[in-house]
């Protein structure tokens, strides 16, 4: 199946964050098996998985990998998916996942999007899709800060270890009236809420959206506006959506970018999405207990966003939801990475904005 067919036919069916966050770098090729479960949002009959072999955003200080870095040559030796009722439970009848009819696939260094063939599962809402893959290679992408339990290793029983490639989308061919993407950093991804709780703000927003709307969580820990603005595969995924929420700025400021630079990056992102026909709900930079120069840039950037300097379709001011009362609105009331309570508040407000955009 071509990626054009994939994006035309399949939409995301989990609110778990999805990204190529960092490169695993083993000194020599290894054969590893990995397993992870995804809670399905809407359910459906046919599923397909999306992958790529490039990094989405710079990890930490960039010493390990940076945005758009290419993974090396590696092989998918086997892949299976099945259904379970709860995360961590063994799947029922697992099915082999194929690529153009073949059960294995060589992934080229730096390869862009590629996808699996469809698999029939007939999942109900709330079921878990169990993904299992065996690969061989030494330089491949994985998601270090995934808010799911990932088991991987060279021998059973597999230990908790996230170094295994995971899908960028768990796609279902259930029809969707509109596709909504959530582009952002660890706050969007869901860090701050318990592992496998699906209590992050994107999940809470999804619960308040119509059943015929799909939600794709494009949040990634350490995510930066400056990286999304490079117009790589990360932003390319967002461009396939009808509406995208954009929430950046914390990591940019903490890594030394000025308010002016953050605003320029946000303008670049919004304009690129508009050129693709995607409408944008822009969130102000969330509170993160910044101090000194960082605090000054936080206030300056947010003042400019609220004034309309970034040409988004709608603006959602996050500070009154997650921050303390003025003059301390830069301080987080629910943790820099919002906890369950903070995520619930933000999710409900975001859903109100999105539901309004759906009828405009």
Named regions from a protein language model:
Residues 276-280:
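A short helix->loop->beta-strand "cap" motif at the edges of active sites that frequently abuts
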Residues 63, 154, 177-271, 289-300, ...:
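Conserved SGNH/GDSL esterase-like catalytic core that processes O-acyl groups on lipids
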Residues 1-183, 188-189, 193-195, 358-360:
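N-terminal secretory targeting modules
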Residues 286-360:
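Catalytic His-Asp segment of secreted/periplasmic serine-dependent ester chemistry enzymes
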Residues 210, 275, 309-311:
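Short, well-ordered coil/turn elements that cap or connect secondary structure elements
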């Amino acid at each position: 199946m071509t990626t054009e067919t994939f994006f035309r036919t399949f939409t995301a069916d989990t609110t778990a964050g999805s990204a190529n966050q960092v490169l695993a770098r083993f000194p020599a090729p290894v054969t590893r098996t990995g397993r992870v479960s995804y809670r399905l949002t809407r359910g459906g009959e046919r599923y397909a998985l999306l992958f790529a072999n490039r990094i989405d955003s710079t990890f930490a200080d960039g010493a390990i990998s940076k945005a758009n870095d290419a993974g090396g040559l590696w092989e998918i030796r086997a892949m299976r998916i099945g259904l379970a009722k709860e995360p961590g439970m063994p799947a029922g009848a697992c099915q082999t996942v194929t690529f153009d009819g073949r059960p294995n696939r060589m992934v080229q260094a730096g390869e862009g999007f590629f996808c699996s063939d469809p698999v029939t599962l007939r999942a109900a809402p709330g079921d878990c899709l169990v993904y299992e893959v065996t690969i061989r290679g030494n330089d491949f992408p994985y998601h270090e800060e995934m808010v799911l339990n990932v088991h991987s290793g060279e021998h059973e029983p597999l230990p908790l270890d996230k170094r295994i490639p995971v899908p960028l989308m768990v796609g279902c061919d259930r029809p969707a009236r509109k596709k909504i993407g959530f582009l952002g950093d660890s706050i969007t991804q869901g860090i701050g809420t318990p592992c496998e709780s699906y209590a992050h703000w994107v999940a809470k927003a999804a619960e308040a959206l119509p059943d015929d709307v799909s939600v794709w969580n494009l949040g990634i820990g350490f995510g930066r506006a400056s990286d999304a603005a490079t117009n790589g595969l990360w932003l390319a995924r967002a461009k396939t959506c009808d509406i995208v929420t954009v929430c950046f700025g914390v990591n940019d400021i903490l890594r030394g970018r000025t308010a002016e630079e953050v605003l320029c990056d946000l303008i670049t992102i919004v304009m690129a999405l508009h050129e693709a026909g995607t409408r944008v709900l822009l969130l102000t930079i969330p509170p993160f207990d910044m101090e000194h120069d960082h605090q000054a840039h936080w206030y300056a950037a947010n003042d400019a966003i609220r004034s309309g300097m970034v040409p988004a379709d709608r603006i959602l001011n996050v500070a009154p939801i997650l921050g303390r009362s003025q003059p301390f609105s830069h301080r987080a009331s629910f943790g820099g990475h919002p906890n369950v309570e903070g995520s619930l508040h933000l999710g409900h407000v975001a859903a109100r904005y999105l539901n309004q955009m759906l009828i405009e």
